C-alpha cells in the first residue's frame, strides 16, 4: 500500500471512528474485565471438602470438569450454596449447577458477572440434551443493560432451528438445537478507537476460547459461532484456538485475517452482509493497528457467502422471515 493511501485510509478511519457526529470516544476507552472472580479468595480458602478446590484463574475447564465429576451430589450443592459466583462462572462446571448458581440473574443463565458493565450468557433451548449448539457473539455496546437484543436473537435462531427440525423430522422440538447468547467479553462502547482496534477483541477471543473449552469439557458438541459486527473480530482472533464446527460472520468490519487460510482453523467459514448495512461504508483495511482487514464476503477471502438481500439493517440479520435467518438455522441444525 502506498504512503499516500495509508495516510488517506488512516484519515478516513479516524473520521469514521472518532470524529463521527453520532458521538465521541471516551478519553481512556473501555477496560477489558480481568482479574479473579468475586469470591475467589473464599473459594480457595474453603477446606470443607478436605480437598483443594481448583483455582479459577489457572485450572483448565477439563480439570474443573474432572473435579466436579468426582464430587457427590451433596458436595456439589454445598459449593453452589457457598460460592455461587465462582460456580456460576467457572467453565467446566456442569450446566445444571451453573444454572442453579446463577438463578438470581434469571432462567438458564450460564454465566453472570456484574462487575463493570457486566457479562452474561443465557441459553435458549435444552443445552444438556442438544444435538447441536450455537453461540452468538455480539458486537459493540452490548452488556448486561443491553443484553436483551442478543437474547432475542438467540431465541429467534433457536425457534427457526426447531421449525426446521420439525419439518425434517430430525429431532423432537426443543431437544435438537440450543443457542447461547454470549455477552462474555467487554465490548466497545460508543464511537471511538476501540471499534477500530483489536485490543478488546483479543481479550474477548481468550474468553470465548475458554468458554467453548468449557462446553467441550462437559460433553457438549462443538458449537457453531454466529459473530455479529465487532464480534466477528473476536471470532477471527479466536479462530486458531476455538473449538467450533462453523464460524458465521455477519455485518463484519473484518476478521483481522486476509483470507480463510489465515484464520488457521478447521471450522467452516460463512459470511453475510446486507446491501443495506452501513458496515459496507467502512474501509476494509488494517493500517497502523486501525481497521480489521479484508471483507469476509469478498470473493478473495474464501468464505461461503450467505444470502442477505432481504436484511433491512446492520442489526437485523436474525429477523424472522429473512433468507439469512433461514440459512443460519440450517447451519445451526447441521444441515449445511
Q: In which residue ranges do the predicted regions lie?
A:
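Flexible, membrane-associating and regulatory peripheral segments of lipid-active enzymes
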Residues: 1-149, 165-171, 334
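Hydrophobic alpha-helical membrane segments, chiefly transmembrane helices and signal peptide h-regions
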Residues: 7-25, 205, 236, 272, ...
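Generic recognition of flexible, low-complexity loop/linker segments
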Residues: 109, 119-124, 213, 235-237, ...
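Lipolytic serine-hydrolase domain surface
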Residues: 127, 139-143, 148-155, 160-164, ...
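Structural motif
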Residues: 132-134, 222-224, 246
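Soluble periplasmic/extracytoplasmic beta-strand elements of cell-envelope proteins
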Residues: 134-136, 181, 226
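Gly/Ala-rich beta-loop-alpha elbow adjacent to hydrolase catalytic centers
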Residues: 226-235
Amino acid at each position: 500500500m502506498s504512503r499516500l493511501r495509508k495516510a488517506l485510509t488512516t484519515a478516513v478511519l479516524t473520521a469514521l471512528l472518532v470524529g463521527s457526529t453520532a458521538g465521541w470516544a471516551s478519553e481512556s476507552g473501555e477496560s477489558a474485565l480481568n482479574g479473579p472472580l468475586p469470591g475467589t479468595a473464599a473459594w480457595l480458602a474453603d477446606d470443607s471438602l478436605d480437598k483443594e478446590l481448583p483455582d479459577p484463574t489457572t485450572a483448565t475447564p477439563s480439570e474443573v470438569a474432572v473435579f466436579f465429576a468426582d464430587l457427590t451430589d451433596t458436595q456439589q450443592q454445598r459449593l453452589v450454596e457457598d460460592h455461587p459466583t465462582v460456580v456460576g462462572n467457572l467453565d467446566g462446571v456442569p450446566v445444571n449447577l451453573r444454572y442453579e448458581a446463577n438463578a438470581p440473574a434469571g432462567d438458564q443463565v450460564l454465566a453472570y458477572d456484574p462487575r463493570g458493565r457486566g457479562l452474561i450468557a443465557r441459553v435458549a433451548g435444552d443445552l444438556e440434551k442438544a444435538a447441536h449448539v450455537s453461540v452468538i457473539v455480539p458486537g459493540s455496546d452490548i452488556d448486561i443493560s443491553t443484553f436483551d437484543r442478543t437474547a432475542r436473537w438467540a431465541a429467534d435462531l433457536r425457534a427457526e432451528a426447531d421449525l426446521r427440525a420439525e419439518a425434517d423430522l430430525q429431532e423432537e422440538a426443543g431437544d435438537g438445537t440450543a443457542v447461547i447468547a454470549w455477552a462474555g467479553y467487554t465490548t466497545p462502547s460508543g464511537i471511538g478507537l476501540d471499534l477500530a482496534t483489536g485490543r478488546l477483541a483479543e481479550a474477548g477471543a481468550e474468553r470465548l476460547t475458554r468458554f467453548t473449552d468449557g462446553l467441550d469439557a462437559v460433553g457438549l458438541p462443538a458449537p457453531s459461532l454466529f459473530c455479529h459486527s465487532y464480534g466477528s473480530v473476536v471470532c477471527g482472533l479466536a479462530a486458531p484456538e476455538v473449538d467450533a464446527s462453523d464460524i458465521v460472520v455477519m455485518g463484519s468490519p473484518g476478521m483481522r485475517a486476509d483470507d480463510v487460510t489465515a484464520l488457521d482453523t478447521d471450522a467452516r467459514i460463512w459470511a453475510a452482509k446486507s446491501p443495506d448495512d452501513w458496515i459496507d461504508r467502512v474501509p476494509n483495511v488494517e493500517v497502523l493497528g486501525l481497521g480489521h482487514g479484508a471483507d469476509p464476503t469478498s470473493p478473495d477471502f474464501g468464505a461461503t457467502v450467505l444470502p442477505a438481500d432481504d436484511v433491512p439493517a446492520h442489526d437485523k440479520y436474525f429477523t424472522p422471515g429473512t433468507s439469512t435467518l433461514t440459512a443460519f438455522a440450517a447451519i445451526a441444525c447441521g444441515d449445511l
